[in-house]
Amino acid sequence: MEWSLSQNKLLAFHRLMRTDKPIGALLLLWPTLWALWVASPGVPPLWILAVFVAGVWLMRAAGCVVNDYADRKFDGHVKRTARRPLPSGDVTEKEARTLFIVLVLLSFLLVLTLNTMTILLSVAALALAWVYPFMKRYTHLPQVVLGAAFGWSIPMAFSAVSESLPLSCWLMFLANILWAVAYDTQYAMVDRDDDVKIGIKSTAILFGENDRLIIGILQVAVLALMGAVGWLNGLGWEYYWSLFVAAGLFGWQQKLIFNRERDNCFKAFMNNNYVGLVLFLGLAMSYL
């Protein structure tokens, strides 16, 4: 019986960290890989690559824990989130806090193997991960903070490889923020009605009937900024083809969200994994 209870607890931690739902980690991973490949260029040091890949999964898990901790009193009122480990009682608040600390410490131990500049930048990464979940109570733009949190691995990657933060770094960082606002607005469109009832703020609520138009403008801006990154770094035709494919994927997402149906909005959000993958493949092939 004790083993069974222990197994149930581990499964609850597994759900709390969303290790069963890798989409968030992948949306964090792709910009990290973009930055490592551009900063290297094309040949990131193996240890630095390993540190960042592991760090992505650890910090995404930590972000999920603190997000659910911040939303623990709201999630029980939303059908999609009512069975999450904290509102359901499968994980206690103390256990969630402990798990968050363990995940952050493991991430920091990895960062300590990198240079001083990257270690200092990691402090901002922790601050963004902690602050983001609470922003949806105070501002309709929490997705901007999410974009900064998901994109902070970009300056960290440039710092770890070259100890510099060139213009390409900041253009890519801005592109990632705009991309995150676009895809997380699609995600927020799924819960918009519930969020209005319980007082949670989001860009989906802020944009209202202009949501599809603004998402489209953001997507065009992402492509333009990533095109500028390619131009600054002399990337080849492979990369520009990947931008063309990404534009097609964005077009497909616009079709999915056209009627604002919950399931299709979620499919549009999930489709962004392919955008990140396609851009990475274009970058990688351009450096071959």
UniProtKB/Swiss-Prot annotation:
<comment type="similarity">
    <text>Belongs to the UbiA prenyltransferase family.</text>
</comment>
<dbReference type="GO" id="GO:0005886">
    <property type="term" value="C:plasma membrane"/>
</dbReference>
<dbReference type="InterPro" id="IPR030470">
    <property type="entry name" value="UbiA_prenylTrfase_CS"/>
</dbReference>
<keyword id="KW-1003">Cell membrane</keyword>
<feature type="transmembrane region" description="Helical">
    <location>
        <begin position="99"/>
        <end position="119"/>
    </location>
</feature>
<keyword id="KW-0997">Cell inner membrane</keyword>
<comment type="function">
    <text>Catalyzes the prenylation of para-hydroxybenzoate (PHB) with an all-trans polyprenyl group. Mediates the second step in the final reaction sequence of ubiquinone-8 (UQ-8) biosynthesis, which is the condensation of the polyisoprenoid side chain with PHB, generating the first membrane-bound Q intermediate 3-octaprenyl-4-hydroxybenzoate.</text>
</comment>
<dbReference type="Pfam" id="PF01040">
    <property type="entry name" value="UbiA"/>
</dbReference>
<dbReference type="GO" id="GO:0006744">
    <property type="term" value="P:ubiquinone biosynthetic process"/>
</dbReference>
<feature type="transmembrane region" description="Helical">
    <location>
        <begin position="33"/>
        <end position="53"/>
    </location>
</feature>
<feature type="transmembrane region" description="Helical">
    <location>
        <begin position="163"/>
        <end position="183"/>
    </location>
</feature>
<feature type="transmembrane region" description="Helical">
    <location>
        <begin position="213"/>
        <end position="233"/>
    </location>
</feature>
<comment type="pathway">
    <text>Cofactor biosynthesis; ubiquinone biosynthesis.</text>
</comment>
<dbReference type="InterPro" id="IPR039653">
    <property type="entry name" value="Prenyltransferase"/>
</dbReference>
<keyword id="KW-0831">Ubiquinone biosynthesis</keyword>
<dbReference type="GO" id="GO:0008412">
    <property type="term" value="F:4-hydroxybenzoate polyprenyltransferase activity"/>
</dbReference>
<feature type="transmembrane region" description="Helical">
    <location>
        <begin position="268"/>
        <end position="288"/>
    </location>
</feature>
<keyword id="KW-0460">Magnesium</keyword>
<keyword id="KW-0472">Membrane</keyword>
<feature type="transmembrane region" description="Helical">
    <location>
        <begin position="234"/>
        <end position="254"/>
    </location>
</feature>
<keyword id="KW-0812">Transmembrane</keyword>
<keyword id="KW-0808">Transferase</keyword>
<protein>
    <recommendedName>
        <fullName>4-hydroxybenzoate octaprenyltransferase</fullName>
        <ecNumber>2.5.1.39</ecNumber>
    </recommendedName>
</protein>
<dbReference type="InterPro" id="IPR044878">
    <property type="entry name" value="UbiA_sf"/>
</dbReference>
<dbReference type="InterPro" id="IPR000537">
    <property type="entry name" value="UbiA_prenyltransferase"/>
</dbReference>
<keyword id="KW-1133">Transmembrane helix</keyword>
<dbReference type="InterPro" id="IPR006370">
    <property type="entry name" value="HB_polyprenyltransferase-like"/>
</dbReference>
